[in-house]
């Protein structure tokens, strides 16, 4: 069962400036927290389309929101196919779109999914369990250079080379099969003083592998551009990120789409293709309140950014 504490619930949904008869998209259904609150704001003419790659999340939401009938539509798909899937439903524009980019707590708390460094489990980490690439493949098949690159780029791990060396040496004799084995190798690769600071020593490498397995950054960048195109003028996009890499993509995409490029001086009018598509609703990200942080430790790295289509 999905018992998931939703982060920045009211801020994210209220930030969409809900029109009761509008059409909205939740790109990250998960435990259905944002969807539940959003549906409660809609009248009979309104509808919500919710995306998730996880079959359990989809089935859970169908049961939970069955009373909404045709107002609630689920799509089992990666949100990288946002435009295509909406067009298949005959939808060409919407009033608002939200993304919550955190791994949902049920995925973290289900040991066999392999997302958590707190449980010993098979190395999996796939959001979509039908996808071919697993964490096992990355850890056992990717070269030393590839591992260093993802640990450094996606995990911002200072000891990327040392950890990759430990993995490379170990797998010469035996495949690395579980999260527990991987955690021990990561610990061995990090000097003892550094192991005692900055949270769990495996946190950054696990993040990096998860991002690589699910191609998360590229997928998000493409989907955010699609969302900006799909939203009507006056409609909004709300995005919750949980690490600096995602936040950087969101910030730069919103900024690029909300500023006018340098044009030759003296132009009588700005051509349409150079006019900004967006207006920033949040100049700086909205952060969880102290009360929310006390209730939900997983909210501590969350940042919310909102933009409106011009």
From Swiss-Prot:
One annotated GO molecular function is: rRNA (cytosine-N4-)-methyltransferase activity
Top-rank taxon, per record: Bacteria
Name the keywords, alphabetized: Cytoplasm, Methyltransferase, rRNA processing, S-adenosyl-L-methionine, Transferase
The UniProt entry, under Pfam families, shows: Methyltransf_5
- Main enzyme class: transferase
Q: Which SUPFAM superfamilies match?
A: Putative methyltransferase TM0872, insert domain, S-adenosyl-L-methionine-dependent methyltransferases
State the EC number(s).
Answer: 2.1.1.199
What's the main place this protein lives? Answer: cytoplasm
Q: Which InterPro entries match?
A: RsmH, SAM-dep_MeTrfase_MraW_recog, SAM-dependent_MTases_sf
Q: What does this protein do?
A: Specifically methylates the N4 position of cytidine in position 1402 (C1402) of 16S rRNA.
The protein here is known as Ribosomal RNA small subunit methyltransferase H
Please report the organism this UniProt entry assigns to the protein. Bacillus cereus (strain Q1)
Q: Which taxonomic lineage is given here?
A: Bacteria, Bacillati, Bacillota, Bacilli, Bacillales
